[in-house]
Swiss-Prot record:
SIS domain mapped to chain residues: 54-217
Keywords carried by this UniProt record: Carbohydrate metabolism, Lyase
Annotated disulfide bonds: none
Main EC class the enzyme belongs to: lyase
GO molecular-function term, one example from the UniProt record: ether hydrolase activity
Family assignment from sequence similarity: Belongs to the GCKR-like family. MurNAc-6-P etherase subfamily.
UniProt record, GO biological process: amino sugar catabolic process; N-acetylmuramic acid catabolic process; peptidoglycan turnover
Subunit: Homodimer.
Note, other: A lyase-type mechanism (elimination/hydration) is suggested for the cleavage of the lactyl ether bond of MurNAc 6-phosphate, with the formation of an alpha,beta-unsaturated aldehyde intermediate with (E)-stereochemistry, followed by the syn addition of water to give product.
Designated name of the protein: N-acetylmuramic acid 6-phosphate etherase
Pathway given in the UniProt record: Amino-sugar metabolism; N-acetylmuramate degradation
EC number of the protein: 4.2.1.126
Length: 296
């Protein structure tokens, strides 16, 4: 029942929220948000298990699939979309599914999250296989859409994780790995787009970023597989080459073009004094890891 969930409780600090000044509201929201990272810290060992599982799936050619309803679903779609330009992966490698489909990203779709079968159907549409990793996201921890999807994923042998913001969440029983970030009562009662949503976003950031490090998408702390889809990212790409190799802007630009705008390739060309094809071949041998390539 909803009344038994911490995310649905009334926050004693904000009982008279409508009487507070804007400054007072901002201060109490800031104070409440400060506890989110502490709640996440308690679950880091479980989040690490998810990262290890996702990385293993990627190495097998599998995909990461986020799945949720409402805010939770939107956060999964957002993180999946950001992985494409940030890490240069295809839009099929990290997928975000939301109950009700794409139109639910901007407006609510009545009844979509209450369907057990809809989650299963959405996974069937993307041809889920056992090498994929499915993460179900639900602040309440009880969304039928997510439960149905997790059950189907486990049925076909895919690894699963559940991320919720309540202790002993219902979805935890339907996943291999359970992350329960207990963020407590919201400033605005029941509005889980607030602390719960913030916690979920931070955890998804951790999972996608750390998993991408694990498959060679990062050199030092540089996004060397960035996809330069606009002028800003083109300039960032050149700055990354400069930072990684200690060359000037003109040299970085020259190798950037010679590498056909592949930052990682340009870096290896410079650091190993090699031509493009040789750099590509050596990167392939090192499974895409720049550090391993240049240390050979």
């Amino acid at each position: 029942m909803l009344e038994n969930l911490a995310t649905e409780e009334r926050n004693k600090k904000t009982i008279d929220l409508d009487k507070l000044s804007p400054k007072e509201i901002l201060m109490v929201m800031n104070e409440e948000d400060a506890g989110v990272t502490t709640a996440i810290k308690k679950e880091l060992s479980k989040i690490e298990k998810i990262v290890n599982g996702v990385t293993e799936s990627f190495r097998k050619g599998g995909r990461l699939i986020y799945l949720g309803a409402g805010t939770s679903g939107r956060l999964g779609v957002l993180d999946a979309a950001e992985c494409v330009p940030t890490f240069g992966v295809s839009k099929e490698q990290v997928i975000g599914l939301i109950s009700g489909g794409e139109k639910a990203f901007v407006s609510a779709v009545e009844g979509a999250e209450d369907s057990l079968s809809l989650g299963k159907q959405d996974l069937e549409k993307i041809n889920l296989v056992k090498d994929d990793f499915v993460i179900g996201i639900a602040a309440s921890g009880r969304t039928p859409y997510v439960i149905g999807a997790l059950d189907y994923a486990r049925l076909i042998g895919a690894k699963t994780a559940a991320i919720s913001c309540n202790a002993n969440a219902e979805i935890s029983a339907h996943a291999d790995i359970q992350v329960e970030i207990v963020t407590g009562a919201e400033v605005l009662t029941g509005s889980t787009r607030l602390k719960a949503g913030t916690a979920q976003k931070l955890v998804l950031n951790m999972i996608s970023t750390t998993s991408m490090v694990g498959i060679g998408k990062v050199y030092k702390n540089l996004m060397v597989d960035v996809l330069p889809t606009n002028k800003k990212l083109e300039e960032r790409s050149k700055r990354i080459i400069m930072e990684a190799t200690d060359v000037d802007y003109e040299t970085a630009s020259k190798f950037y073009e010679e590498a056909e705008k592949h930052v990682k390739v340009a870096i290896v060309m410079i650091l190993t004094n090699s031509h493009k094809e040789e750099a590509l071949n050596n990167l392939k041998k090192a499974n895409g890891f720049v550090r391993n390539t240049i240390q050979k």
